[in-house]
Regions:
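C-terminal luminal/periplasmic domains and tails of membrane-associated envelope-modifying transferases
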Residues: 1-4, 8-132
Length: 132
């Protein structure tokens, strides 16, 4: 998620002002495609937070690193390795869903993600995740 309702910095500072950086192991999301590239660590994350509907702070076509991954998880296709463990109702009808990764992502899931990024950015290798 990358909006004023939910983003990585909101999660990181969830207990402010009492505790700053409450979640020390959270990694920042790659919000802007051409600036940040593909988040290679995505496939190793133990927990994933996805908002429904997907949250953007810019045009969705400039934030495919948010949209493609979130849509793939929300669809549930080829990602049997994710277990929905908690949901939170946020402002403006947004639901934050917390998933726990129970195993590796399937080759089909990785291939689907790789193809979508390659189609969107054929000339930008930094946005071509490995399909494995």
């Amino acid at each position: 998620a990358s909006s004023f309702i939910m983003n990585w910095d909101i999660l990181r500072n969830v207990n402010m002002p009492d505790v700053r950086n409450a979640v020390r192991t959270i990694v920042f999301t790659h919000d802007v495609d051409l600036r940040d590239g593909f988040p290679d660590y995505f496939y190793d994350a133990s927990y994933i937070v996805v908002c429904d509907p997907v949250q953007y702070h810019l045009r969705p076509e400039t934030q495919r690193t948010i949209g493609i991954l979130a849509d793939a998880i929300l669809s549930g296709e080829d990602c049997d390795n994710l277990e929905l463990i908690k949901t939170y109702e946020l402002d403006e009808g947004v639901t934050a869903k917390v998933y726990y990764r129970t195993g590796e992502y399937s080759a089909a899931f990785k291939q689907k993600i790789a193809e979508q990024f390659h189609d969107a950015y054929p000339d930008v290798p930094a946005l071509h995740p490995a399909a494995e």
